[in-house]
């Protein structure tokens, strides 16, 4: 993950040729398609409660190198008096604030109160940090697969919606659709920022994009999504909004696209869905965008796609 945020050139070599956006058949999604836009929002509003969250160790429990500045600070705070004698008894050149306190002649009850208070402050600070951090980041999610049964089921209302295909290989490298595109890394652990906070900002090893690793890390449970994200971090946007997309290279209709409309009993609701479907087909025809329809594979647990002409799509709508 660190390489992905540190060296964008290396990431470009990993980019898939196409990415896919799964949509339910509703007015908002169809307008996005026809206006060539997509909605970018904070991870706070996504369907994963852990989305974008990070952790860092309690600073009082983080190992720090014993430097003259550290000793001076501890002495000024009145924590160290006989600093030379105390430091000579330390087993290594690194220690934590807690370890220093434990070596002092301090009442055990006072020490426990200090530790408990510091943990409470740390938990509150971590919560506030995550909240404020995620408020300033805006993302849009995609998949590198169109053939996932679960993606069609979860994000297109049981295969009744559609999927937009974008050809990334033809996008300008400076365009946000490619420049800000990152793969999601699936892991057992939440991203830990501690080691990066300790790095010297003046060193060649420092990169303020390290924190993006929190936004591209998700639990292993989500790995079926094969997700890629366009990420606009830290003030590049002033709020949730629609942003432009490239021209779609293809639009895939769900395997249940036409039948789901046919089964609607309320005539007014049915007519609304027919009009939305008609809008998709007309847009693809006008823009010369390939129209496909998904179908179940007969050999594997995945979706395949077949070409469908505009005329055939219009005919299927008329027959509903």
Question: Model segments located where?
Answer:
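Partner-binding and oligomerization surfaces adjacent to conserved cores of proteins
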Residues: 1-320
């Amino acid at each position: 993950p660190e390489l992905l945020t540190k060296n964008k050139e290396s990431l470009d070599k990993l980019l898939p040729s196409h990415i896919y956006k799964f949509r339910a058949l509703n007015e908002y999604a169809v307008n996005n398609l026809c206006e060539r836009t997509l909605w970018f929002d904070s991870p706070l509003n996504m369907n994963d409660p852990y989305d974008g969250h990070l952790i860092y160790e309690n600073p009082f429990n983080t190992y720090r190198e014993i430097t003259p500045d550290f000793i001076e600070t501890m002495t000024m705070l009145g924590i160290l008096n006989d600093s030379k004698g105390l430091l000579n008894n330390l087993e290594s050149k690194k220690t934590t604030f807690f370890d220093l306190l434990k070596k002092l002649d301090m009442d055990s009850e006072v020490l426990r109160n200090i530790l408990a208070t510091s943990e409470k402050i740390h938990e509150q600070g971590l919560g506030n940090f995550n909240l404020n951090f995620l408020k300033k980041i805006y993302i849009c999610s995609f998949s590198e697969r169109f053939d996932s049964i679960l993606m069609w089921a979860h994000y297109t209302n049981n295969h009744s919606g559609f999927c937009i295909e974008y050809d990334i290989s033809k996008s300008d490298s400076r365009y946000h659709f490619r420049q800000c595109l990152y793969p999601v890394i699936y892991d057992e652990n939440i991203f830990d920022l501690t080691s990066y906070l300790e790095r010297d900002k003046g060193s060649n090893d420092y990169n303020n994009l390290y924190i993006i690793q929190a936004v591209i890390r998700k639990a292993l449970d989500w790995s079926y999504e094969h997700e890629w994200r366009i990420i606009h971090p830290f003030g590049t946007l002033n709020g949730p909004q629609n942003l432009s997309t490239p021209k779609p290279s293809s639009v895939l209709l769900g395997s249940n696209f036409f039948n789901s409309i046919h089964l609607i009993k309320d005539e007014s609701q049915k007519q609304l869905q027919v009009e939305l479907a008609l809008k998709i087909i007309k847009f693809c025809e006008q823009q010369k965008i390939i129209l496909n329809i998904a179908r179940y594979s007969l050999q594997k647990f995945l979706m395949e796609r077949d070409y469908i002409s505009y005329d055939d799509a219009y005919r299927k709508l008329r027959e509903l």
